[in-house]
Amino acid sequence: MQSNSLLKPRIIDVQSVSPVQARVTMEPFERGFGHTLGNALRRILLSSLPGYAPTEVSIEGVLHEYSTLDGVREDIVDLLLNLKGVVLKLHSRSEATLRLAKSGDGVVTARDIEVGHDVEIINPDHVIAHLAPGGKLDMQIKVEEGRGYVPGNVRPAAGDTKTIGRVVLDASFSPVRRVSYLVESARVEQRTDLDRLVIDIETNGAVDPEEAIRYAARVLMDQLSVFADLEGTAPVVEQSAAQTIDPVLLRPVDDLELTVRSANCLKAENIYYIGDLIQRTETELLKTPNLGRKSLNEIKEVLASRGLTLGMKLENWPPAGLEKLG
């Protein structure tokens, strides 16, 4: 079945309204495709992008969320609501425990949270609480990576969830605050029944609006690829009981002599052996944070020089006794 007669957008206009807002206009689409793609991208943007949020809090002198704390203007419920407004971003890890300790008269902001080199606070001026003279606030904040909105009562927690003084928070992980789309009429030569898709997006600053749309598009492509390959099968590396695995596949990815950026991206995804790498698809690798098309092309070229490709399948991998690296 041929589909090359369908129009694809030839005009793509990206307007950066602010560092956290953008408007993307694409045209022309065949009639109906504007709503089809616009709605799919909107739903993915709102629900499926990874982000970071406070998930648990322990406050010195507080037993539960309905307590009050002497010297703090806000009650604990309001303080927790303010805390959930702090936008954070973790680099090279999926969770962290942070501390906020401040005393004396003044305003407590996100800037007062003690962070390491791999934790970034996007809105450091966000107000968390107000302290009166003699007031003191000392808390431990657990930050985790996740997707969408996850109520605290359904999120699995490590250890004893009944620990006195630990408050489990409802977590809004999504870095996208608002997204809407509009479909307008477009024209190409004599055709006037075409669609123009306009997407307005606002993020919390943890992710660039354009990158958010690119990520959502990759997620959609990855999901649709299942339908495109209904009758196809991925190449399989045949392994018989009498055969041993190609020694090349047992070598660490460091032997490929990739750039430091590419090598670090692979290790962050627990890809330590060449055998691990060749089983990943291009789509899967492009979802890796900080790994772009340039790094992907580098990986493909290095593998091709060894007679290997991405998207291969290995039976009985990993082999018994393979040492875990990392």
Swiss-Prot record:
Q: Which reactions is this enzyme annotated as catalysing?
A: RNA(n) + a ribonucleoside 5'-triphosphate = RNA(n+1) + diphosphate
Q: Which SMART domains match?
A: RPOLD
Q: Please name the InterPro entries in this protein's record.
A: DNA-dir_RNA_pol_insert (IPR011262), DNA-dir_RNA_pol_RpoA/D/Rpb3 (IPR011263), DNA-dir_RpoA (IPR011773), RBP11-like (IPR036603), RNAP_asu_C (IPR011260), RNApol_insert_sf (IPR036643)
What Enzyme Commission number(s) does the record list for this chain? 2.7.7.6
Q: Where is this region: Alpha N-terminal domain (alpha-NTD)?
A: 1-231
Asked if the keyword Nucleotidyltransferase belongs to this entry, the reply reads yes
Q: Which CDD domains match?
A: RNAP_alpha_NTD
Pfam families in the cross-refs: RNA_pol_A_bac, RNA_pol_A_CTD, RNA_pol_L
From what superkingdom does this record's organism come?
A: Bacteria
Question: What ranges does the record give for the region Alpha C-terminal domain (alpha-CTD), renumbered to this chain?
Answer: 245-326
Q: What does this protein do?
A: DNA-dependent RNA polymerase catalyzes the transcription of DNA into RNA using the four ribonucleoside triphosphates as substrates.
**What is said about the domains?**
The N-terminal domain is essential for RNAP assembly and basal transcription, whereas the C-terminal domain is involved in interaction with transcriptional regulators and with upstream promoter elements.
Summarize subunit and interaction data from the UniProt record for this chain: Homodimer. The RNAP catalytic core consists of 2 alpha, 1 beta, 1 beta' and 1 omega subunit. When a sigma factor is associated with the core the holoenzyme is formed, which can initiate transcription.
NCBIfam families, per database record: PRK05182.1-2 (NF003513), PRK05182.2-5 (NF003519), rpoA (TIGR02027)
Q: What is this protein called?
A: DNA-directed RNA polymerase subunit alpha
Q: Which organism is it from?
A: Aromatoleum aromaticum (strain DSM 19018 / LMG 30748 / EbN1)
Lineage here is: Bacteria, Pseudomonadati, Pseudomonadota, Betaproteobacteria, Rhodocyclales
